[in-house]
Swiss-Prot record:
Probably a ribosomal protein or a ribosome-associated protein. InterPro entries: PSRP-3/Ycf65_sf, Ribosomal_PSRP3/Ycf65. One of its GO terms (cellular component) is ribonucleoprotein complex. Signal peptide: none annotated. One of its GO terms (molecular function) is structural constituent of ribosome. It comes from Nostoc sp. (strain PCC 7120 / SAG 25.82 / UTEX 2576). Part of the 30S ribosomal subunit. This is Probable small ribosomal subunit protein cS23. Belongs to the chloroplast-specific ribosomal protein cS23 family. Keywords: Ribonucleoprotein, Ribosomal protein.
Amino acid sequence: MTKFILKILWLDENVALAVDQVVGKGTSPLTKYFFWPRNDAWEELKKELESKHWISDLDRVELLNKATEVINYWQEEGRNRPMAEAQLKFPEVTFTGSA
């Protein structure tokens, strides 16, 4: 997943997911943020990644699997935990937010 970075916006009532592409030594936004549970963020992210035909199936599956893990964690216990704990649990994901 080094070609892409899963970004998470960690909020009290929602979690949002986006993907950036690694370009040189920086990153470039690849998708907008998709919010859960306000919308079906996973399904929206899946459709967005599928529309970018140059993303390999392997990269897409890795991103979606990690998104699933983060959403499940947030639903089951994470929404009541500080963002710092989520960062420790998912060190390969970039977090930002207010929680």
